[in-house]
Design a protein with these regions (language model features):
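N-terminal Sec-pathway targeting helices
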Residues: 1-18
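Function-determining sites in protein domains
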Residues: 20-235
Length: 235
């Protein structure tokens, strides 16, 4: 009986060695196989540069809306430029083209006539992404007020890519800056963008549900501001 077990053990060891040797032999005989690359999201907008204008990036840049007509009407253009610029200045914001350390940046200015002004700024520096949220205690249609909320955090690559997809769906870089609206009260949804030396801004008043509104709402959700905000105040 012991001899039988001994023979079986020897046979098993011999078989195992043979299989291992064969596997190693064929492993070294195999040609190198190129593995498929991991799929990554191409975040360059398909509609870029679209209607954007070339603006030199410089810390000396002082105009928030350079070379951009916020309205075809001269009086409206001057009024809107002054209104929006005063709100941004109250938030200690700078023109996007003046931020030399940012490779790509976007700013959403949310001005509700009777509610607190909000600015959400997101940007990319290399492979890192960031968000800054500012809210004042005044009213978007009147005096800006002073800081009520101010915080910053990093954004994950997934969060950044999700926002890029929202901009892609709305064809942000191809959207006209102005769209005539007959509203007297409401909210201005102003989205600025700067990348590769080009600048674009879109201004809509209480936009209808759709891709552009979704892009703004995405930033508002990421900011956390909607968590304790009544639905009637979101317009």
């Amino acid at each position: 009986m012991k001899r039988i077990f001994l023979k079986l053990a020897v046979a098993l060891v011999t078989f195992t060695i043979g299989v291992s040797a064969t596997a190693i032999y064929w492993l070294y005989r195999m040609e190198d196989v190129e593995l498929p690359a991991v799929a990554t999201l191409d975040t360059r907008p398909s509609c870029f540069p679209g209607l954007s204008v070339r603006v030199l990036k410089s810390t000396a840049q002082t105009e928030f809306f350079p070379a951009v007509a916020l309205s075809e009407n001269a009086w409206s253009r001057s009024f809107l430029n002054g209104w929006y610029s005063r709100q941004l200045e109250a938030m200690n914001e700078l023109p996007l083209a003046a931020l030399e350390d940012e490779d790509e940046s976007y700013r959403f200015l949310w001005l509700r006539t009777f509610h607190q002004p909000v600015a959400i700024h997101v940007w990319r520096t290399g492979v890192r992404h960031f968000m800054v949220v500012k809210r004042l205690n005044g009213q978007g249609g009147y005096e800006a007020g002073t800081f009520d909320l101010y915080w910053a955090r990093s954004l994950s690559e997934n969060d950044w890519n999700a926002f890029m997809m929202h901009l892609e769906h709305t064809e942000f870089w191809l959207m006209p800056t102005e769209k005539t609206s007959a509203m007297f009260d409401g909210a201005q949804w102003i989205m600025e963008g700067y990348r590769e030396g080009r600048y674009h801004v879109v201004d809509r008043q209480s936009p209808d549900p759709g891709a552009y509104a979704d892009a703004g709402m995405y930033l508002l959700r990421q900011s956390g501001l909607l968590a304790d905000m009544p639905a009637k105040d979101v317009y």
